[in-house]
Swiss-Prot record:
This is UPF0210 protein Sez_0396. Belongs to the UPF0210 family. It comes from the Bacteria. Homodimer. It comes from Streptococcus equi subsp. zooepidemicus (strain MGCS10565). InterPro entries: UPF0210. Gene3D superfamilies: 3.20.70.20.
């Protein structure tokens, strides 16, 4: 490595907000199943605190050695609906509290996996878990919940979509932060290191390390050097930058897995913003030539960014996975917040951007009087984009305040302007229930 590359790396960290957003340990809880919920909770606590006992210390050591910030250390676990189903319990709050206590005791930032996979219907544990979500998130600090309501193979479970519209409302009423820790997915992935949607899939090894990188500031600085150049040059520049970012992510993941004695899973190539100035995906898109994010051309700019990041990342790392696309969370991106306040970015444009990025309606505040059926219809729209386009989509919305208010979440979650919602009703559509069938192109065998 020549001196220029060393200087570039130093600049990435000190001036361009490059960091490893998270190292996430995925832990299988399938061997914690028990017919007694209190025994199951004890087993869950024991396994997490044993397997992840050194996760935070190892993360801090690697960050100090490499001089690269590792912002979060997290844990993801087997969807709790699968564990709880073996019990006769009528709610899974004891399991949520066991997760929370384990997370607090080992010092991680979040623990994900209070989850249910219901794309084709409910089993007993799914229904109980979903009804437990509002209180589980209200009575814990670090637990994150997710529900997968659709997949390209299965279609969309519209009964679950309707339920989740109601659950999101109840969760927002039960606690200030609850709805920010709840994600509704279509085509959820099993190796996602990012919260709030991380869970440890049943097809995964017993324990793995997955890494999520972050580098929108680095990409923006690289694009500043090619202003006025063609799209070919633009794409190549993003690709080379993504290669460098991902290479560091792979190094951190390998070091962590070796020191913790667990397998290395994947590097998630997602560009994840923070509320800090200079760490915004929106500003990357504007650097491409848009006056403000949300104007015409935004979706095309996002498509170029997303594709080039993936191409550069795949070259840098032999194990990529997770969501691996640009994140566009409104409250966590100062450029997105400015675009909403400037009247350039609305819910409809964010929905269009979902066809490209990895999440979609993410960390968006809407008026608290929004009907649960309207929230369910938003989920259905996002799920439809994911199911038809064979990609992951998700909704993380917070019904709080009234249009024009600013809702402060603090930390990485930032501040969200309350956005306008279409006032016309979707209630009769949502009331139908049942299943939207899988698309014709899902039949691959």
């Amino acid at each position: 490595m020549d001196i220029r590359q060393v200087r570039e790396t130093v600049e990435m960290i000190e001036e361009q907000h490059f960091d490893i957003r998270t190292i996430t340990m995925g832990i299988s809880l399938l061997d914690c199943v028990d017919s007694d919920i209190d025994r199951a909770a004890a087993k869950i606590y024991q396994k997490i605190t044993t397997k992840a006992a050194n996760l935070v210390a190892v993360g801090d050591d690697i960050a100090a050695e490499l001089g690269i910030p590792i912002v979060n250390k997290r844990v993801s676990v087997t969807p709790i609906a699968l564990i709880g189903a073996a019990t006769d319990a009528e709610d899974y709050l004891p399991l949520a509290k066991a997760l929370d206590q384990a997370a607090c005791d080992i010092g991680v930032d979040f623990i994900g996996g209070f989850s249910a996979l219901v794309q084709k219907g409910y089993q007993k544990g799914d229904k109980i878990l979903i009804e437990s979500i509002p209180q589980a998130l209200a009575q814990t600090k670090k637990v994150c919940a997710s529900v997968n309501v659709g997949s390209t193979r299965s279609g969309i479970n519209m009964t679950a979509v309707a339920d989740m519209g109601r659950i999101i409302k109840e969760t927002a009423k039960a606690s200030e932060m609850g709805a920010a820790k709840l994600v509704v997915f279509a085509n959820a992935v099993e190796d996602n290191p990012f919260m709030a949607g991380a869970f440890h899939g049943v097809g995964e090894a017993d324990t793995v390390i997955n890494v999520g990188v972050s580098g929108p500031g680095v990409v923006k600085r690289a694009l500043e050097k090619v202003r006025g150049e063609s799209f070919d040059v633009l794409a190549e520049t993003v690709k080379k930058t993504a290669f460098k970012i991902t290479r560091i992510g792979q190094l951190v993941g390998q070091m962590a897995s070796e020191r913790l004695g667990v397998g290395f899973g994947v590097v998630d190539l997602s560009l994840a913003p923070t509320p800090a100035v200079g760490d915004s995906v929106a500003r990357v898109l504007e650097e491409m030539g848009l006056e403000m994010v949300g104007t015409h051309g935004t979706t095309a700019a996002l498509a170029l960014l997303n594709d080039a990041v993936k191409k550069g990342g795949v070259m840098a790392c032999n194990r990529v996975g997770g969501l691996s696309g640009a994140f566009i969370p409104v409250s966590e991106d100062e450029g997105m917040i400015a675009a909403v306040q400037g009247g350039s970015l609305n819910l409809e444009k964010l929905e269009a951007m979902t066809a490209i990025c990895s999440v979609g309606l993410d960390m968006i505040a809407i008026p608290e009087e929004t009907p649960s059926e309207t929230i369910a219809a938003m989920i259905a729209d996002e799920a439809a984009i994911g199911v038809i386009n064979q990609k992951t989509t998700a909704v993380r919305i917070i019904p709080k305040g009234k249009e024009g208010d600013m809702i402060a979440f603090g930390g990485l979650l930032g501040t969200a302007p309350v956005m306008a919602v279409n006032p016309h009703s979707s209630a009769d559509f949502i009331a139908r229930g049942g299943q939207i069938p899988a698309p014709i192109h899902s039949f691959k065998n």
